[in-house]
Design a protein with these regions (language model features):
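Active-site acidic/histidine proton-transfer and metal-coordination neighborhood
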Residues: 17-18, 53, 57-65, 75-172, ...
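A short, acidic, amphipathic alpha-helical segment used as a generic capping/interface helix at domain edges
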Residues: 223-235
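N-terminal pre-domain/capping segments
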Residues: 1-101, 130, 168, 195, ...
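Hydrophobic faces of well-ordered beta-strands that scaffold small-molecule active sites
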Residues: 3-7, 31-33, 66-71, 107-109, ...
């Protein structure tokens, strides 16, 4: 399991070269980039193959491969609104394009419903991804669906059902260790989802009470029990990257990056 980190941890004041340099110096072995709105190291819907070639050269320079392509836009692929749904499909296609050119093996997808009722939205999402399956399989890029707090995937059973109904070996789960830790055990989700898990976000969580919680940095105090989490990942045979995801601080992000990479090293040994 390689140590990876999402570029959001560096901050928008730094360009691609500085971002790769800081991530490499901190001790990470890979980096996850993002399809976003405009930003210093953001990929956008307008990013071209020529733009990506420059990033490939930076990646080679620092010997830091791109582990995946995440995104903060275009999640409503389960919407009954055709325009919303098509915009989400276009985002997935763009992520696949970016991943292919950057040598990344996976993208992160966040399905959503818009204003569509939950059950209907899931069936629309499944049909949308079935229609995308030939494109996905042609690229050979893995698509991992992430459970976020948007009310779409409420349990590991919802995730498993959606993935299984789509029915492609290239569509699975991008599991975020902390996103389910508010009311359940992360290791239980890992065990239930099993080999559907294609990629992992390693993130901390601190549940102080039913109504009070936080997402501390990996090297800070949290309530996730990393021993059973790592045991569950090993049991399902997961060997992909552990990608840290956290926001950038004000000022230089180097200290947070170094401490986070060290925290992953320690967690890997559990």
């Amino acid at each position: 399991m390689k140590r990876s980190v999402n570029a959001w941890a560096v901050g928008a004041d730094y360009g691609f070269e500085e971002t790769f340099a800081k991530v490499k110096a901190a001790g990470f072995e890979a980096i996850e980039l993002n399809l976003d709105a405009d930003g210093a190291h953001a990929l956008t819907m307008e990013t071209t193959a020529a733009d990506l070639q420059k990033i490939v050269e930076i990646s080679k320079k620092f010997e830091l491969p791109v582990s995946g392509i995440s995104t903060s836009i275009g999640g409503n692929i389960g919407s009954a609104d055709e325009a919303e749904r098509q915009a989400a499909v276009d985002v997935v296609k763009k992520q696949l394009f970016l991943a292919k050119h950057l040598g990344a093996s996976a993208i992160l997808a966040v399905p959503g419903a818009g204003n569509t009722p939950w059950g209907e939205a899931h069936e629309i999402c499944i049909e949308a991804y079935r229609s995308l399956t030939p494109v996905i399989e042609d690229t050979g890029i893995l698509v991992g669906m992430e459970h976020v707090w948007n009310g779409f995937f409420l349990s590991p059973r919802d995730l498993a059902y959606t993935v299984d109904e789509i029915g492609s070996d290239f569509v699975g789960v991008y599991f975020d260790i902390a996103n389910c830790a508010d009311r359940s055990k992360s290791e239980d989700w890992i065990t239930f989802l099993g080999e559907r898990i294609k990629r992992v976000h390693i993130k901390n969580f601190n549940r102080k009470s039913v109504f009070e919680f936080a997402f501390p940095l990996l090297f800070e105090e949290g309530t996730i029990d990393w021993v059973p989490v790592m045991a569950a990942l090993r049991k399902i045979g997961y060997e992909g990257p552990l990608t840290a995801e956290f926001g950038a601080p004000e000022g230089d992000p180097s200290e947070n990056l170094i401490k986070s990479a060290d925290a992953i090293r320690r967690i890997q040994c559990l």
